[in-house]
Every structure is written in C-alpha cells, then in structure tokens.
Regions:
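Negatively charged, low-complexity tracts enriched in Asp/Glu with abundant Ser/Thr
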Residues: 2-49
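Mixed-charge, Lys/Arg-enriched low-complexity segments
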Residues: 2-22, 86-113
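Acidic, low-complexity, intrinsically disordered interaction modules
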Residues: 32-102
Length: 113
C-alpha cells in the first residue's frame, strides 16, 4: 500500500511526465491557514486562524516546471492534497475545512481516471 506521499508523487509524476526516479525533498513548516489557502476556503469558516502543518515537495524538475505538490494537516486531520502550478494557482485533489470535505478526488491518486 502506497503512502499518501507516494501516491501524490506517482500522480504528479504521471500528470506532468516527470522523471520517475527523481528524488523529492520535503519541506515541512507550520503556517496559519489564512496565509496559505485561497480566501474563499478560509474566510469566516472553520479553518480561520487554524495552524496547518504543511509538507511541500521539491525536486529539480518540479522547480523547473514551477509545480509544488503539497499535503496539509491540521493536528492529525488531513486538510488538503494538491499542488501549486506555474500560475501560482492551487489545484486540489482533496480539501477539507475540518468539519466537512469541500472536494474529494483522492480516487485520482490511486490510479482512477
């Protein structure tokens, strides 16, 4: 069974035709949801002022493509899976506001179309 990180790497690698054997580095920081997520998902909602644990993935090829995959947690709860693209837009495969899922396309991570 692949970890969430492995599933995300597999998905992004295939989506953007990246080298399969390239090592990814991970940067982990804590940041307030309001500073990370687009306003419409945070403003006046349950994520306001919540501290998120962010895991952002890097490699030479990802950097050249300006693609930054990420996984976000609040405490132990999964909040978001996705990537930031070359236009600095956040594309989500999964987004949860701590109370209910706003978007769930995790089936894409396990090879579904």
């Amino acid at each position: 069974m692949m970890t969430l990180e492995q599933q995300l790497k597999h998905y992004i690698t295939n989506l953007f035709s990246l080298p399969k054997d390239e090592k990814w580095e991970c940067e982990s920081i804590e940041e307030v949801a309001d500073n990370i997520l687009p306003d419409q998902y945070v403003r006046l909602g349950p994520l306001t002022n919540k501290i998120l644990h962010t895991y952002t993935y890097y490699s030479d090829t990802l950097h050249e493509s300006n693609i930054y995959p990420f996984i976000l947690y609040h405490q132990k709860q999964l909040i978001a899976i996705g990537y930031t693209d070359e236009n600095h837009d956040m594309d989500f495969l999964y987004l949860h506001n701590t109370i209910m899922p706003l978007l769930d396309q995790r089936y894409l991570l396990t090879g579904g179309q």
